[in-house]
Swiss-Prot record:
Name the UniProt record assigns to this protein: Hemoglobin subunit beta
Subunit structure: Heterotetramer of two alpha chains and two beta chains.
Modified residues annotated as N-acetylalanine in this record: A1
InterPro entries recorded: Globin, Globin-like_sf, Globin/Proto, Hemoglobin_b, Hemoglobin_oxygen_transport
Organism from which the protein derives: Alligator mississippiensis (American alligator)
Gene Ontology molecular functions: haptoglobin binding; heme binding; metal ion binding; organic acid binding; oxygen binding; oxygen carrier activity; peroxidase activity
Family: Belongs to the globin family.
PANTHER family: HEMOGLOBIN FAMILY MEMBER (PTHR11442), HEMOGLOBIN SUBUNIT EPSILON (PTHR11442:SF7)
Residues where heme b binds: H63, H92
The encoding gene: HBB
Domain Globin: 2-146
Keywords recorded for this protein, A-Z: Acetylation, Heme, Iron, Metal-binding, Oxygen transport, Transport
GO biological process: hydrogen peroxide catabolic process
Gene Ontology CC: blood microparticle; haptoglobin-hemoglobin complex; hemoglobin complex
Role this protein plays: Involved in oxygen transport from the lung to the various peripheral tissues.
Length: 146
């Protein structure tokens, strides 16, 4: 589904205010704390026994920034999200063997983080636009899975 002018404005305007490093670290940390079984994908990041370890893990913070920066590319490619994420989908499917359900979970967490960091901007219309965006990104990342 394509984005109308109002949805695009909500997405672009809010994204311009996002601190990618802070929100990315927050989003990935939240996923690893709320869904501890997801830590198995990141065992090489070192000690992650509890929330404190995760919140202070520099590798989690760096990867969170990388993940959210990649998500931000969707904002620049609203007309071709699936095409833009084709290589990343293949990588996560074939090399990392990530369960595609993780993309939906992380998308939902990104929504929570954006709302928490930008409550004054996160109207119900903005929420709807970003929910549509995270669904499309999750579907694009899952496209290589059979």
């Amino acid at each position: 589904a394509s984005f109308d002018a109002h949805e695009r404005k909500f997405i672009v305007d809010l994204w311009a205010k996002v601190d990618v490093a802070q929100c990315g670290a927050d989003a990935l940390s939240r996923m690893l704390i709320v869904y501890p079984w997801k830590r198995r994908y990141f065992e090489h990041f070192g000690k992650m026994c509890n929330a404190h370890d995760i919140l202070h893990n520099s590798k989690v913070q760096e990867h969170g920034k990388k993940v959210l920066a990649s998500f931000g590319e969707a904002v620049k490619h609203l007309d071709n999200i699936k095409g833009h994420f084709a290589n990343l989908s293949k990588l996560h499917c074939e090399k990392f063997h990530v369960d595609p359900e993780n993309f939906k979970l992380l998308g939902d967490i990104i929504i929570i983080v954006l709302a928490a960091h930008h409550p004054e901007d996160f109207s119900v219309e903005c929420h709807a636009a970003f929910q549509k965006l995270v669904r499309q990104v999750a579907a694009a990342l899952a496209a290589e899975y059979h």
